[in-house]
From Swiss-Prot:
SMART domains: Ribosomal_S6e (SM01405). One of its GO terms (biological process) is translation. This is Small ribosomal subunit protein eS6. Keywords: Ribonucleoprotein, Ribosomal protein. Belongs to the eukaryotic ribosomal protein eS6 family. The gene is rps6e. The keyword Glycoprotein does not apply. GO terms for cellular component: ribonucleoprotein complex; ribosome. Pfam families: Ribosomal_S6e. InterPro entries: Ribosomal_eS6, Ribosomal_eS6_arc, Ribosomal_eS6_CS. It comes from the Archaea. GO terms for molecular function: structural constituent of ribosome. Signal peptide: none annotated. The keyword Ribonucleoprotein applies.
Length: 125
């Protein structure tokens, strides 16, 4: 059974909250990709209770990224749930120290699998 830590951000005020889900709700996230949206009701989340302010019930959550069990970040441009070493010059998982620097880094693909531990999401009103 999968267990995920969801980091849900509210772009209106910049507040982020962490929630842990498991069981059937977590299984609904497996196979989803970065950029896809899912209803908060579908995951059994009460956003008003989590954020402590009134949030509409029909609010959706957009997947923005995540990390796997070993801390490797998910990248939207790597397809599938696999872990690969790619040559990167910018973006998630790499901060160049000098201009034009490229480096080979291990990253996770853009699809959620049971190996993912943390999923970053934002509210879409």
């Amino acid at each position: 059974m999968a267990t995920f830590k969801l980091v849900i951000s509210n772009p209106k005020n910049g507040i982020a909250r962490q929630v842990e889900i498991s069981g059937e709700e977590a299984e609904k996230l497996i196979g989803k990709r970065i950029g896809e949206e899912i209803s908060a009701k579908e995951l059994g989340l009460n956003l008003t209770e989590i954020f402590g302010e009134e949030i509409p019930a029909d609010t959706k959550l957009k997947i923005t990224g995540g990390t796997d069990k070993d801390g490797f970040p998910m990248r939207p441009d790597v397809h599938g749930p696999r872990r690969v070493k790619i040559l990167v010059s910018r973006g998630p998982g790499f901060r160049p120290k000098e201009k034009g620097e490229r480096r080979k880094k291990t990253v996770r693909g853009n699809t959620i699998s049971p190996e993912i531990v943390q999923i970053n999401m934002k509210l879409v009103f």
